Amino acid sequence: MSKRPILIGITGGTGSGKSTVSKEICRRFDKELIVMIEQDSYYKDQSHLSIEERVKTNYDHPNAFDTELLVKHLKELSYWSKVEKPIYDFELHNRKNETEIVEPTEIIIVEGILVLEEKEIRDLLDIKIYVDTDADVRIIRRLVRDIKERGRSLDSVINQYLNVVRPMHMQFIEPSKRYADIIIPEGGHNKVAIDIIVGNIKQMVQKSE
């Protein structure tokens, strides 16, 4: 194929609803047309560290991510080559040995907290979206997710939020809002915004045909 896939970056604070927005956009297209890449899958390999040391890693800092590999994979997908995406184990705080094959599609969504903060990623994107949600809503969502899905204790989630998540949000994530083409308030519940974005993507796909 000569045309390049459309790359869409979706970011926002932890618990903002960016995953909900991403999944809702994906739901509006045929499965063979769209794929989602989670930045979380590209946390660095920490096999050389003990589990006690891994727990202390600042996972909301740019240094926690293997951005070089993510950029490489996005470029390969842009040239219609499949990639082997890492699989991350949130309970062990490390990559799994197996990987997931991701086939190139006409529309590629990359979703994560630092997607717009990282210039190397940002420069590849055709559409840049920031999901903006109140801090109190985000912390409640984070509590529910990390306790239910990631095996964390209430105390550990609260401590991590106060000492790491919130400071990193103010330092890296919130400032990246200025790079967004579209800012979505109310997260994944903003149907009007999602309708507009989906309509714009469909127009871009038609123009590239």
UniProtKB/Swiss-Prot annotation:
Pathway(s) it belongs to: Pyrimidine metabolism; CTP biosynthesis via salvage pathway; CTP from cytidine: step 1/3; Pyrimidine metabolism; UMP biosynthesis via salvage pathway; UMP from uridine: step 1/1
User: Does the record's keyword annotation contain Nucleotide-binding?
Assistant: yes
Q: Does the keyword Kinase apply?
A: yes
From the Swiss-Prot or TrEMBL record, give the protein name.
Answer: Uridine kinase
- What family does the Swiss-Prot or TrEMBL record give for this protein? Belongs to the uridine kinase family.
Give the catalytic activity: uridine + ATP = UMP + ADP + H(+); cytidine + ATP = CMP + ADP + H(+)
Q: Name one GO cellular component term.
A: cytoplasm
Cell compartments where the protein resides: Cytoplasm
Q: Which residues bind ATP?
A: G12, G13, T14, G15, S16, G17, K18, S19
Enzyme Commission number(s) from the entry: 2.7.1.48
Give the record's keywords alphabetically. ATP-binding, Cytoplasm, Kinase, Nucleotide-binding, Transferase
Its gene is udk
Q: Which Gene3D superfamilies match?
A: P-loop containing nucleotide triphosphate hydrolases
Chief subcellular location equals: cytoplasm
Say which domain of life the source belongs to: Bacteria
Q: Cite the GO molecular-function annotations of the record.
A: ATP binding; cytidine kinase activity; uridine kinase activity
The family database entries (NCBIfam families) matched by this protein are listed as: PRK05480.1, udk
State the top-level EC class: transferase
- GO biological process annotations for this chain's record? CTP salvage; UMP salvage
